[in-house]
Structure formats: structure tokens, C-alpha cells
Amino acid sequence: MFVDLNSDLGESFGSWKMGNDDQILPVVTSANIACGFHAGDPLGILKTVRKAVELGVTIGAHVSYPDLVGFGRRNMDLSRDELIADVLYQISALDGLAKVAGSKVQYVKPHGALYNTIAHDQAQAAAVIDAIKMYNPELVLVALAGSNLVEQARVAGLKVVSEAFADRAYNSDGSLVSRRLEGAVLHDSAFVASRVVSMLKNGGVESIDGVFTPIQADTICLHGDTDGALEMSAAIKAELVKNNIEIRPFVNKA
């Protein structure tokens, strides 16, 4: 059994710092790097890209709605052409920086509201899928495990990897509990670590309503910007190793 560990990185903006990139990068196998639309400035993004290359971490484009003020967490009703152009712009920008650093973008993981919206909105999902195919049909799409997007993207010809979240609570339908609700984000490192192992071995987790919810995940997202993120990431990695679950990139395994 193996699993990939990913994290959202490159999200600092000028003097405003977000996350713990230097500490999280040695733990993960895939880096979802901001592309400037929800967070990240060119210099900071390039530094994160170079560090990822140095550590042999796979680079992915963390594309978003154009929403710096809302950190990409606000829904936006964009036209199909707008969304396609936005996604193309972001992938190509990050891929250019990756090329300079001696690497390339190998997958796309939408961020925040865009991620949640295309999990169920077929029209916006189609725009994102088409943008990825226009740029490079070999790119892998990271999608919420169990969502309609997984099948939609596969039917469209994309390689898809299903993702689960280590520190997020789930509704019984497999969707993420809104961050606005109490209990949406989990903070107990030991509990989260054992929950990740249980999820992988048993194929699901207990929802916020106490119902077993099936989740088949190929990659686990570790958030680097929450309280205790470093301790939690280390605990998760240690628990995976303890249970003989290999940690390796999902690229070429999608």
C-alpha cells in the first residue's frame, strides 16, 4: 500500500507570510504551488519551486478563482471563456517558473472555492478540464475523492487522482464540512494521524454525523497553515511509516 502526501505552498505575499513551506516540503511528495490568483507573489513562488526541485518534490499548479482579497475562498460566477483563460494563465505561469528551476508542472489541483465548486458543478468543471487538456492533456487532475468530478474528468480523458484531507471533517455525503462550522478543522495530531491510517486501510472515515463515509484516496492533503501543522504533519508521516504504508508521489500512477 502506498499514498502520496501533498500540501498547499507558495502562498505568502510580499511581507505577508502564509504557511511553513521550508518545514513542510521535506515531509510531502507533491507540492500544490500557488499561481498568484489567490495568493503568492512571483519571487515567493519561484523560491518555493526551487526548494521543491531541490528536494525532489513533484510540482502541481494550485489554480484558483481570481480572488486575492478572499484568498480564493469565495465562489465566483465566471463565464466559461474567463475560467478557461484564468486556468491556462496560472498553469503556464507556474510551468514557466518551474522550467527555469529545471522542472515542470505535472498536475493541477484547484484551490478553495474553485475546488469545492467543480466537485459538483459540471459546467465549471468542464471549463477547468478543457483548460488542462488545452495546455497539456498529460497533466493529472487532483479531485475530491468520491466527487462527480472524478468520473467527469476521466470520461473527458484526463488522468485523475482522488484526494482526502487529513485535518478536515467530512459530511456523510463525502463533502467537506464548511470551514464556517464548528468542528470543520481537526487539531489533535495523534487523532488525525490514526484517522489517516484508518481511512487508507478501511476505505473511509466517520463523518461529522457519526456515519461511516467511504473515501478512496490516492493522496492526502496536509495543511501547512493551521495551528500545529508541523507537529501534525510529522505525526501523520510517522504513523504511515509505522503501519508500513509507503509514501511516494502519485505522478505516473494515476
From Swiss-Prot:
TM segment ranges: none
One biological process term in Gene Ontology: carbohydrate metabolic process
Domain of life: Bacteria
One Gene Ontology molecular-function label: 5-oxoprolinase (ATP-hydrolyzing) activity
Keyword ATP-binding among record annotations: yes
Alphabetical keyword list: ATP-binding, Hydrolase, Nucleotide-binding
EC annotation from Swiss-Prot or TrEMBL: 3.5.2.9
A Pfam family: LamB_YcsF
Reactions it catalyzes: 5-oxo-L-proline + ATP + 2 H2O = L-glutamate + ADP + phosphate + H(+)
Alphabetized InterPro entries for the sequence: Glyco_hydro/deAcase_b/a-brl, LamB/YcsF/PxpA-like
Known function: Catalyzes the cleavage of 5-oxoproline to form L-glutamate coupled to the hydrolysis of ATP to ADP and inorganic phosphate.
Record's subunit section: Forms a complex composed of PxpA, PxpB and PxpC.
Family to which the UniProt record says this protein belongs: Belongs to the LamB/PxpA family.
Protein name: 5-oxoprolinase subunit A
Organism this protein belongs to: Acinetobacter baumannii (strain ATCC 17978 / DSM 105126 / CIP 53.77 / LMG 1025 / NCDC KC755 / 5377)
Lineage: Bacteria, Pseudomonadati, Pseudomonadota, Gammaproteobacteria, Moraxellales
Gene transcribed to yield this protein: pxpA
